[in-house]
């Protein structure tokens, strides 16, 4: 494979999905074709699994079921969309990938990092991003954003207790510290304009020959 894989990570409320939408016009100027996508989802069956995972009515889904649903969606997405694009030399930029499972299920759900790492490896055959942008934000600020900006469309994970969201953020910070060569941390508490500018600066510096 000679493509480039970039992932965007962060707690709910960090604004990474909005940032991706904002940077797309600029990164689509890269010399290679850019393929934006998301997890869970990205392909038909994985999008259907996404609806099951996030539906607030599905309260019977326990932590282990949730983890395996994410892994199944990830496998489908990788096989059908990500790998073909990477093999064709394209730039794949994905909103959430393997680190979300480690942060949310490994730390947030207390399933353990080793278990989640193993399942991630099994589902992806060891595929890892070339670069991961981690959008960091205080948990209380993030939850306030969720209630303010997404009050009409909160999902099952949004409704979790604040303590779970704090564990997720703490987990992310530990993950970032373990792989400083892969991660770049961006302060997501800034204005959207500043976060977008910081994100583009990182991408253009890291992949200077691609622009």
Swiss-Prot record:
ATP binds at residues 10-17. The keyword Nucleus does not apply. One of its GO terms (molecular function) is dTMP kinase activity. Keywords: ATP-binding, Kinase, Nucleotide biosynthesis, Nucleotide-binding, Transferase. Gene3D superfamilies: P-loop containing nucleotide triphosphate hydrolases. One of its GO terms (biological process) is dUDP biosynthetic process. Pfam families: Thymidylate_kin. Its EC number is 2.7.4.9. SUPFAM superfamilies: P-loop containing nucleoside triphosphate hydrolases. It comes from the Bacteria. PANTHER family: THYMIDYLATE KINASE, UMP-CMP KINASE 2, MITOCHONDRIAL. Phosphorylation of dTMP to form dTDP in both de novo and salvage pathways of dTTP synthesis. This is Thymidylate kinase. It comes from Lactococcus lactis subsp. cremoris (strain MG1363).
